[in-house]
């Protein structure tokens, strides 16, 4: 990825935002395995703020073996074992708000996933205006496999997408849409 300048315009231990030129802000993870943690979540909010103020678009891209392996479940487990419920609630709420900020941003947001795009990584893509996925992209809301409900608005975005084809003014029985959306 071509970057303008020698340093990111924003950054912390979990993620960075770079000026890519042509009015585009690039957002990339620095966390272990491109996992989502408090630092990544904080940087999502800062990057959207900066992009809406100083840029015309934002692209989410990553380096490494996978686009994103989802939430750092070891950090989640550690917080749960220490009964840090308020910290967990805040992390989930901030991430949900972050993915929704992408969705409702005043600038277009494009995600460029590749390889493993799991859990929260897929939810980032679902919150984006457009997705340019690599041919070998394997995506899923895999949290269910460890007994968790996806927490970054992914299930809501799946349901909204299933309702997009319903004509305006029609009041459908949404049960059929819900079961079809979540049956797999």
Q: Language model features by range: what are they?
A:
Residues 88-92, 96, 100-184:
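Conserved catalytic cores of soluble enzyme domains
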